[in-house]
Amino acid sequence: MVAITHTPKLKHLDKLLAHCHRRRYTAKSTIIYAGDRCETLFFIIKGSVTILIEDDDGREMIIGYLNSGDFFGELGLFEKEGSEQERSAWVRAKVECEVAEISYAKFRELSQQDSEILYTLGSQMADRLRKTTRKVGDLAFLDVTGRVARTLLDLCQQPDAMTHPDGMQIKITRQEIGRIVGCSREMVGRVLKSLEEQGLVHVKGKTMVVFGTR
């Protein structure tokens, strides 16, 4: 359920960063607001971010997480210049982040000189599309227990997951899991209790050990 990128990273990162403005964001601060104008591409130098959408009642759903080496804010880059649509999602710093920002115009200029930059971005977009397609399928075909279990396995692949003698250890709140799978915090709690009774996980607060994962 969680989008995780395993796509190629830039070989000539310094060349891109030389044309970027670098900014630091504290944990939980908003980097992109839904409804903003699309005119800038972002690249994560250090840290990780959360991509999410929000309905009219303020309820949030987490689309995925991006980590060091990933681009975001790229959709407007491929729209007709001057006719870009507004940002469709929010992006928030999951932890303290260092992010490089570059205008679409400058990125287009650089990509004409070095196609590898555009290829890397395209590879990441393709990977996210695959993950999004899988998430839509999960929402349609898996019950809540299946979606929570899939999410826990995906989170074990995130950079902040820690190895544990019995598997992998992750830290996440029930509320955040609910925002990923599309259910209430209470429902997540019931599912986690069931998984623990089956001997699949151990849960203590927001720390969870997923057994048999490495």
Swiss-Prot record:
Residues 174-193 bind DNA. Residues 142-214 form the HTH crp-type domain. It comes from the Bacteria. 3',5'-cyclic AMP binds at residues 59-60, 73-75, 87-88, 132-133, 179, 185. GO terms for molecular function: cAMP binding; DNA-binding transcription activator activity; DNA-binding transcription factor activity; DNA-binding transcription repressor activity; sequence-specific DNA binding; transcription cis-regulatory region binding. GO terms for cellular component: cytosol; protein-DNA complex. It holds the Pfam family HTH_Crp_2. Disruption phenotype: Mutants show loss of twitching motility and are defective in type IV pilus assembly. Expression of ExsA is also strongly affected in the mutant. Keywords: cAMP, cAMP-binding, DNA-binding, Nucleotide-binding, Transcription, Transcription regulation, Virulence. GO terms for biological process: DNA-templated transcription; positive regulation of DNA-templated transcription. Gene3D superfamilies: Jelly Rolls, Winged helix-like DNA-binding domain superfamily/Winged helix DNA-binding domain. Induction: Regulated by both cAMP and cGMP to allow differential regulation of different regulons. Cyclic AMP is required for Vfr binding to vfr, regA, ptxR, and cpdA promoter DNA. Cyclic GMP instead inhibits the formation of Vfr-DNA complexes. Global cAMP-dependent transcriptional regulator that controls virulence gene expression by distinct cAMP-dependent and -independent mechanisms, which allow to fine tune its virulence program in response to specific host cues or environments. Controls the expression of many regulatory targets including type II, type III and type IV secretion systems, flagellar-mediated motility, and quorum sensing systems. Transcriptional control is exerted by binding to a well-characterized consensus site (5'-ANWWTGNGAWNYAGWTCACAT) within target promoters. Homodimer. This is cAMP-activated global transcriptional regulator Vfr. It comes from Pseudomonas aeruginosa (strain ATCC 15692 / DSM 22644 / CIP 104116 / JCM 14847 / LMG 12228 / 1C / PRS 101 / PAO1). The lineage of its organism: Bacteria, Pseudomonadati, Pseudomonadota, Gammaproteobacteria, Pseudomonadales.
